[in-house]
Structures are given as C-alpha cells and as structure tokens.
Amino acid sequence: GSTLYVSDLGSRCIWAVDAAARELTAGGRGCTAAFAGLPGYPGALAVDTDGTLYISYRWARSGWLEKNADSTLLRGIALRAGQNTQERLFRCTADAPCAEAVSLATGAWEQTFTGLVQDSCAAVCPVESKVYFGAAGADSLLAANR
C-alpha cells in the first residue's frame, strides 16, 4: 500500500502510516516513527518523483522548551504563542537547518537547507532542479538548488 508521512511538531518526528489505515494514534500500532530527533519542529512535507522526502522546519529546536516542557501542555502553549514570542524561543541561527531532504529508499540524508533568510519555513515544494520555500512573513517564495 501507499505510505502517508505525517509531521509531529510536539515530538519533533515524522510518522509513517499506511494510507489506508483508520483511527491511528501517533506511536500506536501501525504507526511508526520514520524519522525522529529532528533538529527542528517539522511543518510542511513534500515528496518528489525520485522518492525524496523534503521536511521543512517551522521553528528551530528550542533548548529551553525541550528542557522545560515535561508536559505536552507547556509545549503546546509555546508552539501556539504569539509570533514575537515564538521568534525569541525558536529563532534559527545561520547554521540551523530550515529544511532537509532524505531518501525514502535508503533513509540517507541528502541535503540540508540553512540560513536566516529561510527562517520559519512554512511550506516546501520540490520542482525539477529547485526547491521552493514559503517562509513566514515573506512576500515571495525562496528557492534553492537541489
């Protein structure tokens, strides 16, 4: 069957589930973590025709949040805070990934997209030799070679 990939902000992972499955719980029977311990909070996902999964990170991993968020309640509140608060908590550094590409066939990480210009990546779309990003607050799409 077909596989559906689901991003989980709270757990910083990507779940893989059978697309025909019904009533699944993250981490439950029939739902496996395809990619865990990600360097950011995953948002948009896209798969190209070559079988590469593109993961955009809505925010960078927050050491403060990971240290203090013992419950999903605090993590959920922080992830739903106002934009100014989120930028202070989750601001990407110049070397922090805003998106990554991973081969679904081999599980190998193929490319990392970094830089403050692509901070807070809300959408990702691979097209031929380019990857386009929709960044929060940007008036136009950003592009990178793949």
Give residue ranges: language-model regions.
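Histidine- and/or cysteine-centered catalytic micro-motif in compact active-site loops
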Residues: 2, 9-11, 19-20, 37-41, ...
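Short, conserved, GDST-rich strand-edge loop motifs in beta-rich repeat architectures
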Residues: 58-94, 141-144
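Blade-edge beta-strand/turn elements of extracellular beta-propeller
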Residues: 15-38, 106-115
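Structural signal for beta-propeller blades
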Residues: 12-14, 61-63, 99, 139-142
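Beta-propeller blade signature
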Residues: 89-106, 146
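Short acidic/glycine-rich loop or secondary-structure boundary segments that cap or lie
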Residues: 13-15, 25, 42-46, 54-56, ...
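Conserved beta-strand positions in repeat-built beta-propeller and related beta-rich domains
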Residues: 1-11, 55-59, 89-94, 133-139
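Beta-rich, blade/repeat-based domains predominating
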Residues: 1-3, 37-51, 96, 116-130, ...
